[in-house]
């Protein structure tokens, strides 16, 4: 279906092209339709606002139809087209993610087997197919690792039994991925502060251990 925009000076501002089967056969027999007559094929597309006959199509004037209805139909058709394209695109991308190289490996193996006519060529074809299969297995394994990985956690707030929102004892932040234990061993620190405290505590314990080892070495020469 084709739509054309005409200026206001013409007798019609919208036209469409439809098939003969969609209209009555009498439309092509110079019969009057809404005060318009079908023109000769040579004069087709030279005048506006009339019914034209050309090959297997006829052009019908929209001068008797409200523009609001026409625009609404066009808008609905465009929305349906975009929705269909998105569905097909998402389906194709999901299939490509599951088996990204299966089609390429299969086509390569088949083409090599068709062109081989001697035993040496057959051996080369099988060798290339084996390489392609191993490459496909490695790629599939790589994609499977991505799909089975744990999703990223989001920050959240915790409401205490008394109705107050829990906050970090160090930075006073209320949003965190998880609560971690600090000096009080009561999970009073947010995730960043808890990780920093753990690293600092680990360094302090390492220094204490090294100092204790030095004292032991001095006492036992």
Curated annotation (Swiss-Prot):
Residues 101-121, 137-161, 201-221 are annotated as: Disordered. Residues 142-155 have a biased composition (Basic residues). One of its GO terms (biological process) is regulation of DNA-templated transcription. It holds the Pfam family GATA. It comes from the Eukaryota. GO terms for cellular component: cytoplasm; nucleus. Residues 203-221 have a biased composition (Basic and acidic residues). A zinc finger (GATA-type) spans 168-193. GO terms for molecular function: sequence-specific DNA binding; zinc ion binding. It is found in: Cytoplasm; Nucleus. Keywords: Cytoplasm, DNA-binding, Metal-binding, Nucleus, rRNA processing, Zinc, Zinc-finger. Disulfide bonds: none annotated. Residues 101-110 have a biased composition (Polar residues). Present with 2100 molecules/cell in log phase SD medium. Plays a direct or indirect role in pre-rRNA processing. This is Pre-rRNA-processing protein SRD1. It comes from Saccharomyces cerevisiae (strain ATCC 204508 / S288c). The gene is SRD1.
